[in-house]
Amino acid sequence: MLMLRSPYSDSNALDHFLDELTGSVQFPYWRNADHNSFNFSDNIGEIVNDESKFSVQLDVSHFKPENLKIKLDGRELKIEGIQETKSEHGYLKRSFSKMILLPEDADLPSVKSAISNEGKLQIEAPKKTNSSRSIPINFVAKH
């Protein structure tokens, strides 16, 4: 039985080997990194949605408080951050935008926010109080 080999098979294997070998030298270490880890603002921490309140915590430690904006349009809560840094070595711009839909029973005029020294932004919306209540029946005796 006559077996023919492709004249290119050894060449392809060698090319593949050399590509893998030189690829790690030619490109920076971060090329194959998980680029999601470079997204500093994608860290939504604790979310609480119970009978009394809805609250969310975000890590915004890479942003100055003056570079953050919180807007409420109906039940849509939008959180944005933009930071720009210029130096003699270059330009760095970080930004993020989050949209969170608040629950229907959130008391929208009472939404408040606070930021800690560690850069944790806490946004809290208390829930509306239940407007239904029990009405006692009083007995009135006739004279």
Swiss-Prot record:
Cysteines joined through disulfide linkages: none
Annotated sHSP domain residues: 35-140
Gene Ontology cellular component annotations, sorted alphabetically: cytoplasm; nucleus
Biological process per Gene Ontology, one example term: IRE1-mediated unfolded protein response
Gene field: hsp-16.41
Stored PROSITE patterns: SHSP
Family: Belongs to the small heat shock protein (HSP20) family.
Designated name of the protein: Heat shock protein Hsp-16.41
GO molecular function per UniProt: unfolded protein binding
InterPro entries cross-referenced by the UniProt entry: A-crystallin/Hsp20_dom (IPR002068), Alpha-crystallin/sHSP_animal (IPR001436), HSP20-like_chaperone (IPR008978)
Sorted UniProt keywords: Stress response
Organism field: Caenorhabditis elegans
